[in-house]
Regions:
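Structural micro-motif
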Residues: 54, 106-122, 209, 235-236
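Bacterial N-terminal signal peptides
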Residues: 4-17
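N-terminal leader/targeting and pre-domain segments
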Residues: 23-51, 149-156, 160-168
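Thiol-based oxidoreductase modules, predominantly thioredoxin-like and allied folds used
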Residues: 35-39, 60-61, 81-103, 201-207
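Typically the conserved alpha-helix immediately C-terminal to a functionally engaged Cys/Sec
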Residues: 67-84, 186-198
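Flexible coil/turn and secondary-structure edge motifs
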Residues: 144-319
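Non-catalytic, surface beta->alpha helical segment in thiol-disulfide oxidoreductase systems
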Residues: 74, 114-156
């Protein structure tokens, strides 16, 4: 069941083809993504001391192997990740395949191997690691989670768009439940606002309207999710996989068969948000942002805007 839903989620994790890159540099070598990098290490330390922002110290091989190119093209091009690197940190690029100058000096100082896969260190103005070094951090979710940890270690506030990105891409903790109801528009609206819900999708199961809910099981227990659906009186039945059907609930608990589920047409998805999306069609949104905006637009527009990043908000204001 999880493989089926993660495939569906992956198809929607980032919506809309257009993004205003602001300070991002999209003419970079492929290995270093779209971040606007500094090569002035000492200047970065001074900027960190002045601002309190951590230094995002990126050791990378340029030109690099397939793994380095994949990291640059698939991770360091995500607009929200790029925004967080540029706005919440002082980004510095170190080439790990140069034998002289600042690059060689920093490789030696930090004990980093040359000609290696990418490594990111988060350091303060005194050149101390804010969190322990970790290798093999090669995906969006893992990097976003470490950025969150580094900001916390530096006693910096963590923007919601970044912490949400870490949750949304933490696929090892994403679970699903399917709620049968009289109206899947209501299901997306009601269930999408629950803390820990990552995504919703309107669909049909055995010909009946359902809402597919993807949630982060470290932030939201299944029994709490089902309890919320009960309290909001928006579901009659919950369809679960083999390992979850023992949950106690006033709702009917039934076994889920993935091959009998199909998504509703696009015209039925995120119904509360459709006109708003038409008015802001150039705005790029993750699936979690779409889910939250759909739930908060009608009843709490201020809460809705909290899910957007500063650059996204600036795009709204520039219409």
């Amino acid at each position: 069941m999880m493989g089926f839903f993660l495939a569906v989620l992956a198809a929607f994790l980032f919506i809309s083809p257009s993004w205003s890159a602001a300070a991002s540099d999209q003419d970079n070598p492929i290995e270093i993504g779209h971040v606007s990098w500094s090569r002035d290490y000492q200047g970065a330390l001074q900027a960190s001391r002045h601002s309190g922002k951590p230094v995002f110290l990126f050791f990378q091989e340029v030109p690099g192997c397939l793994g380095c190119r994949t990291f640059g093209s698939q991770v360091l091009t995500h607009p929200l990740l790029v925004e967080a690197v540029e706005d919440e940190f002082i980004p510095v690029l170190v080439y790990n395949n140069r034998r002289t100058g600042m690059d060689a000096q920093l490789l030696n100082q930090y004990g980093e191997p040359s000609w290696n896969y990418q490594v990111i260190r988060f350091v303060d103005a005194n050149e101390r690691d804010l969190i322990p070094r970790r290798d093999r951090v090669w995906d969006i979710g893992s990097l976003a989670a470490r950025m969150v940890a580094a900001l916390k270690a530096a006693d910096r506030s963590v923007p919601l768009y970044l912490s949400s990105l870490a949750v949304e891409y933490d696929t090892s903790h994403l679970q699903t439940a399917v709620f049968g109801m009289y109206c899947f528009w209501t299901g997306e609206y009601e269930l999408g606002s629950i803390a820990g819900v990552v995504a919703t999708e309107a669909g049909f199961y055995r010909g009946r309207e359902v809402t597919l809910v993807t949630y982060h099981n470290d932030q939201l227990a299944l029994k709490v999710l089902i309890g919320e659906a009960e309290d909001r009186q928006c579901a009659r039945t919950v369809y679960l996989n083999d390992h979850s059907t023992a949950v106690q609930s006033r709702l009917k608990i039934k076994q889920f068969e993935p091959n009998e589920y199909q998504p509703a047409p696009a015209s039925d998805q995120k119904k509360q948000l459709q006109q708003w999306l038409m008015d802001h069609r150039n705005l790029s949104l993750t699936m979690m942002q779409l889910t939250k905006l759909n739930s908060f637009l009608a009843g709490d527009p201020e809460a809705m805007l909290q899910w957007l990043s500063p650059r996204q908000l600036a795009q709204l204001g520039s219409r």
